[in-house]
C-alpha cells in the first residue's frame, strides 16, 4: 500500500513554497494533502511562511514577527522562484484554510511556528480560524514545540496533533537550496567535503556572507523559541532524549496521533515505526524527494511521506511496489479426462469443471 503523499509547503519544487498556487498545484498533481507553516505577525495576524526571515523569498530583509500583516501583503513572494509567479502574495491562514476546504480529500499538516515572545494567545487564534473555516477534521496540527500541541489538545481535544522531532542538528542548520546554488553547490550533507573550497570566496562576498549569517541566526532563534527559557545545555539534552522516540513520546503528558521525523531516522532506529504503531500512533517521514529514498523507505511501514516532489513520489512508489509484488501463482495444468461413456457424460463434464 502506498503511503499518503503530503506535499511539503505545497508543490514547492515547481511553485513558490507555502503559497496558494503551490497548494493548488500539489492537489492537481494527485497529492493526498499539503504541509504548511503558520506564524504570527507583530499585529497578531496569522500568515503562512516557513522561516522567520523573509530574505530568501522577497527583495527585502526582515522578520515575520517584526512586520504587520499589511507590510507583508505588499510584498512579492513569488518572483524568487520564477518570473511567472511575480506578485504572488503571502497567504493568511484564513485564505489557506478556505482554499483547502474547496479541494476534496485535502489533508492539511499545519505546522505551528513558535512565537518569539511565547504568546499564550497564538494557539487559540489558530484554533479559532480552524473553527471558522470548518477545517478541524481535515487538519493535523504539528509542531516541534510540544507545549503548543499540549495546549491545542487541552483547548480542542478532538483535533489531531503530530509531534515533530528533530533529526541531526547539523542537517537542521544546513542552508536551503537557493543559498547552496549561489555557492555553486547542490544541497545536502554530501557537499560538506567540497564546501571548504567555496567558503573563502563566499566569505569575501558581503552579500553571500550576510545571507549565511542571517540564515544561521534565524535557525538558532527558531530553536530557542521551541524551547523557551531553556539553556543551550537543556535544549541539547531534550534533543538527545528524542533519539529514543517511543520512550520520548511515552514521556509526554498528551498522546499525539502522529509523529513526524526526518526520514534518515528510519535507517538509524530500526523498529521505532512499528513500536509507535503499537502505541496507536502514525508516522510521517520528511523530506522524501528521490526515487532511491522511496525504494528503501517502502521497506518500512511509514504512513506518510512529506515531499517536495508530489509529482514523482507516487509514481516511484507504485513502480517499486509493482516490481516487488509476489508473482501470481500459475494454475496447475489440468490433464483432460478421457471421454466418459455416454450414460455418464454429464457426470464427467461436471468433474472436469
Protein language model annotation of sequence segments:
Residues 1-353:
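Phosphate-group recognition and catalysis centered on beta-loop-alpha active-site segments
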Amino acid at each position: 500500500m502506498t503511503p499518503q503523499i503530503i506535499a511539503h509547503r505545497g508543490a514547492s519544487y515547481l511553485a513558490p513554497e507555502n503559497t496558494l498556487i503551490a497548494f493548488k498545484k500539489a492537489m492537481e498533481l494527485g497529492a493526498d494533502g499539503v504541509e504548511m507553516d503558520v506564524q504570527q505577525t507583530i499585529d497578531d495576524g496569522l500568515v503562512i511562511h516557513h522561516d522567520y526571515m523573509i530574505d530568501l523569498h522577497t527583495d527585502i530583509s526582515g522578520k515575520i514577527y517584526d512586520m504587520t500583516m499589511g507590510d507583508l501583503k505588499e510584498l512579492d513572494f513569488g518572483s524568487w522562484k520564477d518570473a511567472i509567479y511575480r506578485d504572488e502574495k503571502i497567504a493568511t491562514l484564513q485564505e489557506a484554510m478556505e482554499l483547502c476546504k474547496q479541494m476534496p480529500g485535502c489533508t492539511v499538516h499545519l505546522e505551528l511556528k513558535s512565537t518569539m515572545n511565547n504568546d499564550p494567545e497564538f494557539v487559540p487564534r489558530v484554533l479559532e480560524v480552524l473553527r471558522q473555516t470548518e477545517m478541524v477534521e481535515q487538519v493535523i496540527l504539528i509542531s516541534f514545540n510540544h507545549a503548543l500541541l499540549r495546549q491545542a489538545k487541552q483547548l480542542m481535544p478532538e483535533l489531531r496533533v503530530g509531534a515533530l522531532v528533530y533529526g541531526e542538528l547539523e542537517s537542521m542548520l544546513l542552508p536551503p537550496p537557493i543559498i547552496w546554488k549561489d555557492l555553486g553547490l547542490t544541497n545536502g550533507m554530501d557537499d560538506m567535503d567540497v564546501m571548504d573550497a567555496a567558503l573563502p570566496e563566499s566569505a569575501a562576498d558581503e552579500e553571500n556572507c550576510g545571507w549565511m549569517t542571517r540564515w544561521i541566526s534565524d535557525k538558532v532563534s527558531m530553536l530557542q523559541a521551541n524551547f523557551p527559557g531553556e539553556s543551550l545545555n537543556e535544549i541539547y539534552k531534550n534533543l538527545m532524549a528524542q533519539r529514543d522516540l517511543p520512550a520520548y513520546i511515552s514521556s509526554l503528558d498528551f498522546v499525539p496521533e502522529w509523529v513526524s521525523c526526518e526520514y534518515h531516522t528510519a535507517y538509524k532506529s530500526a523498529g521505532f515505526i512499528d513500536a509507535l504503531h503499537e502505541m496507536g500512533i502514525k508516522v510521517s517521514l520528511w523530506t522524501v524527494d528521490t526515487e532511491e529514498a522511496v525504494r528503501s523507505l517502502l521497506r518500512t511501514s511509514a504512513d506518510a511521506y512529506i515531499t517536495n516532489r508530489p509529482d514523482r513520489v507516487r509514481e516511484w512508489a507504485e513502480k517499486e511496489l509493482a516490481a516487488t509484488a509476489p508473482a501470481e501463482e500459475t494454475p496447475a495444468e489440468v490433464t483432460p479426462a478421457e471421454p466418459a461413456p455416454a450414460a455418464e457424460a454429464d457426470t464427467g463434464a461436471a468433474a472436469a469443471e
